Structure formats: C-alpha cells, structure tokens
Amino acid sequence: MASPRSVPTPFPARSATGGLAGYAEQFAETEGYLDFARFGPPSRDVLDTTRQLLEQSARADAGTVDELMRQELRARQAAARLLGDVPPAGVALLPNTSTGLFHAAFGLPHGTVLVPAREFPSNAYPWLRAARLGRVQPVSLEPDAYGRVTPELVRQALTPETVAVSLSAVDYRTGYRADLGGIREVIGPDRLLVVDAIQGMGVADLPWTAADLLVTGGQKWLRSGWSTGFLYASPRALERLEPTLTGWTGVVDAGVLDSQEHAPAPDAARFSLTNLSPVTAGAFAAGLELVLRTGVDRIQAHIAERTAQLIDTVRSAGGVVLSPEAEHERAGIVAFTMPRAEPAVVAANLAEQGVTATVRPDQLRLSAHASTTLATVDRVHRALTSLPV
C-alpha cells in the first residue's frame, strides 16, 4: 500500500553566490557549519523519504514489508552507479564503515596487512581483533613527514607475507587524498586493497574500483543520515575473503527456513549479517540519487573553491595549514593551527562567530561542502583575525 506523498520539508533557498545552485537548496544547515567531515546534515529528499517510508509502515498491510524491502535494491543500484561500471550485485548495504572493515579483517585467515599509523580507529580495531584470534596480523606503516601514505612508501613496506593494504582514501586529519591507483599498481594482483572511503565518497573523483573491498558510511559527505553505508567487493575480494561473518541473509536461498546451513551467496550479499532498516535504505538511496543528479564533478569543484578560500583565510590570519598544498592531493578538509593561540581559544572565537568546526587538542579542522557559502568563509576570517595578540 503506497502512502500519500508528504508535504515537502520547507527549506530556505540558497543564492547562486553561496552554495552550489541546484544542490544547496536541499539543505538547511546553519550558516557557519564547517564540520562535514564529522557529520553532514541530511537533505530535504532524505528527510521526506524517511517520513514517507515511516508513514507507509504505519499503515501496514499484507504487502507493506515486501514493498519496503525493495528500498535495499534501490540503494545498491544508486551506489553502483556512483562507483561507475559496477554491477549492483557487487554492492552490499552496511549500517556503518566499521562493519565492512570487520568483514575484511575476519575474512583473511593469515598473512600480514599494512595499516597506516594514526589511521582513524575504525581501521585499526578490526585488524587487532582478528590478530588476537590468530588470523591476519596488522603491520603499522608510518606516513612520510607530511602525513602522506604514498605508493613508494607502500612498495618499500611490502613483504612476501603481505596479503593486503588497508587505508583511508582521504585522511580524516589532513584531507590528504591517497593515490589509490598508484597503490593498486605497486601491490600487484596478489594482494587486496581495502579502502575506507567515508571522507571522500560523493565529493572526490577517485578511482574507487582500484579497491578490492571498499567501505563507506553515508552520514558524512553523502549526507544521508546515520546507519547508512555500503560495501563494494571486487571479484578478487569475493575469491580471497572467507565469509567468516556471513549471517542468515548472506546465504543462498536465505528465504528457505529449513534449519540447514546454506552456502554463502556468490556475490557481495555474502557480507550481509541480517536485514537492515528499509527506512534507512530508502533514505540512503535518496541521498545517493541527489549526488548522482548533481554530479560529483560539480560538487567537487565547489568544495575545492571553498577549501582554497578557507586555506587563504587561515594563512592571511597567520595560521599554519596542515593540509596538502596541491589541490589534487586534498579533499574538503582544512586542518590548521594558530601559533599564537591554543586550539581551545581559537575554537571559542569560531563559535562566537557561529562557526562549527572540529576541535582537537593539537589542531582544528574545517570541512566545507557544496552548500557552504562565502558568508561562512567570512565568519572564519572574523574569528581568526580577532584572536588576542
């Protein structure tokens, strides 16, 4: 039973001089919001889809559950289109990035995996837990002096025991974009490349299918809300990874409830543990479809412009930018320090000007999106130039 369409969420329009026209109108975050690397406020489409599906579930009849469950395929199809030439069967939905990384870690029975030092903890704990069970062992890979994990560093660290490399496509601290194509080339066809794409998916044009196992969440740059995400598995990953964590929905003939163990599904469905919420699947589909309609290239270009403006603003105020200099090496993150002020003091000034940023003990992080306005950059300028001398 289809529910009547809800009244669309009334968001304010954005001017063309502010956010990206045709995209920014979907959003209602406050001016000054620069924390997309932590959480991306969802779009009107995501909110409306969530409301519609919940209303549909509230009027449940004999066909409601089956109809709602079709949202899972809709989301997988959208994710496959975003990745490029990928079949939907190569995609499985996830509730978060960590779940996908646990599938990778527990799927490798032996050998070593290179994991960059100072990675986000979600790319550390799965390998540590697997190692304690006697499976694959993590080996720390130290970045260069600029915090980069380059193909040459990876090449030098490879040993005959290395079975995989696991890293973030975009570093959460600095916004550095990993050279996925170069790393894929140096590790060769006999090792797996595991990629956490959460800080770049939908906003950075990277060769995503260089990864054998790619995982991402939808709550940051894809702006689809929490408990959303997907996994892409290449044919090589499906061949090499043991389906250790496969649940009842990840097997052949999952709907046949005969109390027998079924074989794992032949495609990415084998990474399913159980049914996920069709409401969040529909919301995720709506978020992905908005990115597809807008175009990653347009979103990326707007973010690059705002990021460059933020970098200039920080430097003009005497700040030290920790993010990469070259535009092709950075995404939407600007990490910086102010030599004459502690991060907590800078954070207080930013907050006074209505700027939302990530504050860490040793640095601050600004992250702009395609809805970020010039007025937001001006707020940062006022905050940094009014610091006490």
State each model region's role:
Residues M1-V389:
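Pyridoxal 5′-phosphate
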